[in-house]
Design a protein with these regions (language model features):
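Short hydrophobic alpha-helices and adjacent helix-cap/hinge residues
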Residues: 1-327
Length: 327
């Protein structure tokens, strides 16, 4: 009997050891979306593309991924509040749009993986050591392509052969001053007079356009950051009312009334950023993932705006357009 009991005990013990452990409930990874320019209510085309790509990669919000949205609606002062909150929530990855958000996130969350998607100058901003080997907790996409600044002004001159005095609209508190400086260098090379026009908030736009009319500027080049991007519809409306042609960086501005844009697709960059998030969630380290630069650029023209401004776009420019907006 004693032998039988011992045998049964041994069998039960062996069975318990062999049985798989009951699976523990896994907490889904938590990512945060951080943007100054994004309106907290209206859909943003950049984040729409980002989230769609995450879905295609198999992530379903509320099931296998948790998403924290922190959109400031152009109010840069809210960044500190957002980041303090995210630090307490222990997010796994922060996805950011522009330079300012990315720099603030890196400073506030030095051990959290950060994926940037629309940063102008990640090296100059101190986000990465170099593009090939970021070397820290930040990686992703940059819009930096030095040839773009000259190309945009060349296209503006092609559309408006008589143009000589051009305004450059930018947010001076943004970290993307490299783009502004490169545009000024390109303007000097092309013999254009370039006037810096600084706008820090939506309330300053009316005064800026009063300056444009007073100084009789003939066109406007827009340097994009989160604040400017969020006000693109208002900027386009004021430009048309001032009969001022605009050269912008991305299609999203042309959709709202900018005359011409030449640059990378923000939607394509957002989709690539989602791929970076996927790689990091699967174990890759930001320090080891090279920062990607855009290689494909799109020329977009708004004929409705051209008509409103009384302009005829040269056929040579129309033939090269990737997209023409007529309505």
């Amino acid at each position: 009997m004693m032998i039988l009991r011992a045998a049964l005990a041994a069998a039960l013990t062996a069975g318990l050891l062999a049985a798989p452990l009951a699976p523990r409930a896994q907490t889904p990874p938590r990512i945060a979306l951080l943007s100054i320019g994004t309106d907290p209510v209206k859909p943003n085309p950049v984040w729409v593309q980002f989230l769609d790509q995450l879905g295609q990669l198999g992530y379903v919000e509320g099931r296998n991924i948790a998403i924290e949205r922190r959109f400031a609606g152009g109010r840069q002062e809210r960044l500190a509040e957002f980041l303090a909150d995210l630090a307490g929530r222990r997010v796994d990855i922060v996805a950011t749009t522009g330079d300012v958000e990315s720099v603030a996130a890196k400073q506030a969350l030095p051990t959290t993986s950060i994926v940037m998607m629309l940063v102008q100058d990640p090296i100059g901003a101190g986000l990465v050591a170099n593009l090939a080997h970021p070397g820290g907790n930040v990686t992703g996409l940059t819009t930096l392509a030095p040839e773009l600044y000259t190309k945009r002004l060349e296209l503006l001159k092609e559309a408006l052969p008589a143009v000589a005095r051009v305004g450059m609209l930018l947010n001076p508190t943004s970290a993307n001053m490299a783009a502004a400086n490169a545009t000024e260098t390109a303007a000097r090379r092309l013999g254009l007079q370039l006037r810096r026009l600084e706008v820090r908030d939506p309330q300053g736009l009316s005064e800026t356009f009063s300056t444009i009319r007073r100084e009789r500027l003939q066109a406007l080049v827009v340097v994009t950051d989160g604040v400017v991007f969020n006000q693109r519809a208002q900027i386009a409306d004021l430009a048309i009312k001032s009969r001022l042609p605009m050269m912008c960086e991305v299609k999203e501005f042309v959709v709202t009334g900018c005359l011409v844009a030449y640059g990378p697709s923000y939607g394509a960059l957002a989709r690539r950023a989602a791929v970076y998030v996927d790689k990091i969630l699967k174990g890759a380290k930001p320090a080891d993932l090279p920062v990607e630069q855009p290689t494909n650029f799109e020329l977009v023209i708004n004929l409705k705006t051209a008509k409103a401004l009384g302009l005829t776009i040269p056929p040579s420019l129309m033939q090269r357009a990737d997209q023409v907006i007529e309505q």
